[in-house]
């Protein structure tokens, strides 16, 4: 058997045979020629020590700038844990639960898209999960698993193909014994899809398919051709390129170690990677071009405040005004505002119900202080809505706030329904402030 050794000082190793780490670099030991196989960059010990978070990625990043950085071994392990974890996708009604591994769904979806003629440039982990990989103790936590497929979506046909492919892939994850013949794409959509979004205009071309999980850990598959604004704040601007790790899963016969693992690139679409990473570690709120942030940015901003993040400077007051204005542009109707707030509370506070009240009071304070685009009655209407939701949260938790700040709601007596009776007084809703964490077993007097 003819063996050849390929030395790489940049970590380029051809898969197709056996591999070993040796000395200050890597040897690839192949049974045949090294040419013709897939190539993957390897991280590890290029100079006698383990890879550090400060390694530059000029040899691997598409645009070698300060936007990119190489993940260290600890971060690679966290990423591997996320992609290898089995996540249940819960079906509605009598549909069975799907056991879905992120790395596997990415592999299946990508392969079928390419079979249909839709090229996938790369796949990335995005959002809070990417931030968690980079810094585990950031305080952000993560729920949704946001996976981005950078794909070519030229027209309506490609968007429809993406939808069909994802729904068809779900059939592969149904438990054995399930009769798949009569299950239609529409049935799968109703059973397993939390939401679908399609945006197609001059600046943005992307679609989102969110697979539902009862604990809020949805798997979100996002297919992006172009997207003008990819982040809201620096701490959620991170994306991790998964291609080298996915190729390692597919090709390597040996497990990863500290000295033998693929080189994985992290990128900050905010700008300077180290600046954004410093914001993440020190819980700093910063952004660029705040006028581009959509209406949901206000809700994310208040969530960061509740989690202990603080503005980078006093100029954040201007940012608050931008975000309030945009929120009321995107959600101008009080009904839309209520649906958006209720949805946000439901999706972002799973297991954190005790923080909902503080969150709503923080939102109340920001809206009260920084809203300049509304008529007085519209502003009061929104503030009253936030207060009502806060009181509902307290009721759900069986907690009563400080007596001096309680708003009383009266149930009308039966005779009030009489058309001739008009002496009923509706109490004005007042803001609720910091909750004194006590419970009371009796009714309290009203001020």
UniProtKB/Swiss-Prot annotation:
Q: What class of enzyme is it?
A: transferase
Q: What happens when the gene is disrupted?
A: Homozygous mice lacking Tent5a have slightly decreased survival, probably due to perinatal or embryonic lethality, since the effect is already visible at postnatal day 6 (P6). Mutant mice have an abnormal posture with frequent kyphosis and a wavy tail. Mutant mice exhibit frequent bone fractures and newborn mice reveal rib fractures. Adult mutant mice show decreased cartilage ossification of the tail.
Q: Which residues form the signal peptide?
A: none
Q: What is its EC number?
A: 2.7.7.19
Principal subcellular localisation of the protein: cytoplasm
Q: Which UniProt keywords apply?
A: Cytoplasm, Transferase
Q: What's an example GO BP annotation here?
A: regulation of ossification
Q: What induces it?
A: Increased during osteoblast differentiation.
Q: Describe tissue expression.
A: Expressed in primary osteoblasts derived from neonatal calvaria and osteocytes. Strongly expressed in calvaria and femur.
GO MF terms, alphabetically ordered: poly(A) RNA polymerase activity
What's one Pfam family here?
Answer: NTP_transf_7
What is the superkingdom listed in this entry's lineage? Eukaryota
What is the documented function of this protein?
Answer: Cytoplasmic non-canonical poly(A) RNA polymerase that catalyzes the transfer of one adenosine molecule from an ATP to an mRNA poly(A) tail bearing a 3'-OH terminal group and participates in the cytoplasmic polyadenylation. Polyadenylates mRNA encoding extracellular matrix constituents and other genes crucial for bone mineralization and during osteoblast mineralization, mainly focuses on ER-targeted mRNAs.
**Into which family does the record put it?**
Belongs to the TENT family.
What name does UniProt use for this protein?
A: Terminal nucleotidyltransferase 5A
Q: What species does this protein belong to? A: Mus musculus
